[in-house]
Swiss-Prot record:
Protein's name in the database: Platelet-activating factor receptor
Originating species: Homo sapiens (Human)
Disulphide bonds in the chain: 90-173
Pfam families associated with the record: 7tm_1 (PF00001)
Sequence similarity: Belongs to the G-protein coupled receptor 1 family.
PANTHER family according to UniProt: P2Y PURINOCEPTOR-RELATED G-PROTEIN COUPLED RECEPTOR, PLATELET-ACTIVATING FACTOR RECEPTOR
Membrane topology, Cytoplasmic segments: 39-54, 114-133, 206-233, 297-342
Gene assigned in the entry: PTAFR
Chain ranges passing through the membrane: 17-38, 55-74, 92-113, 134-155, 185-205, 234-254, 277-296
A single cellular component GO annotation: plasma membrane
UniProt xrefs under Gene3D superfamilies: Rhodopsin 7-helix transmembrane proteins
Source organism phylogeny: Eukaryota, Metazoa, Chordata, Craniata, Vertebrata
Subunit: Interacts with ARRB1.
Task of the protein: Receptor for platelet activating factor, a chemotactic phospholipid mediator that possesses potent inflammatory, smooth-muscle contractile and hypotensive activity. Seems to mediate its action via a G protein that activates a phosphatidylinositol-calcium second messenger system.
Keywords: Cell membrane, Chemotaxis, Disulfide bond, G-protein coupled receptor, Glycoprotein, Membrane, Receptor, Transducer, Transmembrane, Transmembrane helix
Inducing stimuli: By CSF2/GM-CSF, IL5/interleukin-5 and n-butyrate.
Length: 342
């Protein structure tokens, strides 16, 4: 398979799409994940963190690492894909993007496996020292993924290309592959196949969880509520994977082949457009991950519900106070002026 020479491809719609999408994700993601960390710090002493809570906190931290780089990417796309910031920040942004993506995949995977064990082996899971295992697994995940991502810190991450007007040059960030590079292709094949291996394991575990829960007889209303929440959690995890991660990894390998020059220019443009959309979908996991926590921990869900009803009550009280004042003031203003003089 010989590489073809092809001109630089661009998808100009991304200069409008990314600043809008990333701005929304940044605001919602910082609020949601910041609130999650605050709730965990307030409700749970560190010594009482079980395995599932350890994974949740680590997943939130991975999301926050990506969120702090979003302003850098917003500036980049607002400048028509021109990296005007210091070069090392491009390396940092690319490194944290990789860390967030695959830490999220890994922690969602171990969360799913935790629930799989809880459903299929409830007694053994209840007796196990899951806190120690949670800490150990989290350390392994961070060391492995940060170690792999450190490559992006030493990589020559920027390259110069002519701008769309042809009047000058722009500096791209992580948008250049050497044509025909077999090592780059092998790395991407490994990443994509590793992802789909994890996804198939998660899909299998979730299907077993759903089947087991549906086969269990429901004897009490409380058990029905627990089962409903567990099913929603499973569906939410699958939705996050299918919406955020699967489209990107379906497109990633064909896009890499096109970038390396192994596909014709017509296909290259189409796959590049699709790649930009999947990058946007990939970043939405920072907003969707906190939704999973509502189905995983009772205290978190209770705290969120109490805050919601507290806000509603405050609005009702405020509205009632305003109505009362209006009822008093309006009749007073309708009193004839001559009667006030008597």
């Amino acid at each position: 398979m010989e590489p073809h020479d092809s001109s630089h491809m661009d998808s100009e719609f991304r200069y409008t799409l990314f600043p809008i999408v990333y701005s929304i994700i940044f605001v919602l993601g910082v609020i949601a994940n910041g609130y999650v960390l605050w709730v965990f710090a307030r409700l749970y002493p560190c010594k009482k963190f079980n395995e599932i809570k350890i994974f949740m906190v680590n997943l939130t931290m991975a999301d926050m690492l990506f969120l702090i780089t979003l302003p850098l990417w917003i500036v980049y796309y607002q400048n028509q894909g021109n990296w005007i910031l210091p070069k090392f920040l491009c390396n940092v942004a690319g490194c944290l993007f990789f860390i967030n993506t695959y830490c999220s995949v890994a922690f969602l995977g171990v969360i799913t496996y935790n629930r799989f064990q809880a459903v299929t082996r409830p007694i053994k899971t209840a007796q196990a020292n899951t806190r120690k295992r949670g800490i150990s697994l989290s350390l392994v995940i961070w060391v492995a993924i940060v170690g792999a991502a450190s490559y992006f810190l030493i990589l020559d991450s920027t390259n110069t290309v002519p701008d769309s007007a042809g009047s000058g040059n722009v500096t791209r960030c992580f948008e250049h592959y050497e044509k025909g590079s077999v090592p780059v292709l092998i790395i991407h094949i490994f990443i994509v196949f590793s992802f789909f291996l994890v996804f198939l394991i998660i899909l299998f575990c979730n299907l077993v969880i759903i089947r087991t829960l549906l086969m269990q007889p429901v004897q009490q209303q409380r058990n029905a509520e627990v089962k409903r929440r567990a099913l929603w959690m499973v569906c939410t995890v699958l939705a996050v994977f299918i919406i955020c991660f699967v489209p990107h990894h379906v497109v990633q390998l064909p896009w890499t082949l096109a970038e390396l020059g192994f596909q014709d220019s017509k296909f290259h443009q189409a796959i590049n457009d699709a790649h930009q959309v999947t990058l946007c979908l990939l970043s939405t996991n920072c907003v969707l991950d906190p939704v999973i926590y509502c189905f995983l921990t009772k205290k978190f869900r209770k705290h969120l519900t109490e805050k919601f009803y507290s806000m509603r009550s405050s609005r009702k009280c405020s509205r009632a106070t305003t109505d009362t004042v209006t009822e008093v003031v309006v009749p007073f203003n309708q009193i004839p002026g001559n009667s006030l003089k008597n």
